[in-house]
């Protein structure tokens, strides 16, 4: 799931996530939502739907400093964490950056999207292993 509000950053995050998923032979679909606050709702809808996925990757970015940016980021991450504690397997690739340049560095050079995808895959594997105990 990708938040498209900052499209250039979202594209870079998706590139990293897609590469990581492809490297691991994972099948996936790309779903877009407007912004980071819509990510948890969309993932919850998919997870509770008739054909849930094994794992989800949340990708998006909040730019700027100050109370509004901090609140958007914190609330999106809080809701994603809550989904995780309720058993939804997901990797969180939501970024908070001062500006687009910093966000592009996190998304590209630091491969935040790939890291989120690998986290989701690792958690999906862990869930399978724990189910066998």
What are these regions (language model features)?
Residues 22-50:
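Active-site rim loops that border cofactor/substrate pockets in soluble metabolic enzymes
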Residues 1-33:
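Glycine-rich phosphate/diphosphate-binding loop of Rossmann-like nucleotide-binding domains
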């Amino acid at each position: 799931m990708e938040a498209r509000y900052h499209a250039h950053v979202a594209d870079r995050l998706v590139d990293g996530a897609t590469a990581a998923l492809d490297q691991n032979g994972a099948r996936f679909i790309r779903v877009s939502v407007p912004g980071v606050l819509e990510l948890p709702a969309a993932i919850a809808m998919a997870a509770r739907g008739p054909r849930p996925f094994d794992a989800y990757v949340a990708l998006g970015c909040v730019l700027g400093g100050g109370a509004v940016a901090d609140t958007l980021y914190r609330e999106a991450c809080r809701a994603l964490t809550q989904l995780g504690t309720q058993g939804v397997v997901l990797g969180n690739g939501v970024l908070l950056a001062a500006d687009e340049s910093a966000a592009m560095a996190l998304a590209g050079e630091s491969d935040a999207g790939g890291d989120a995808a690998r986290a989701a895959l690792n958690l999906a594997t862990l869930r399978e292993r724990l189910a066998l105990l």
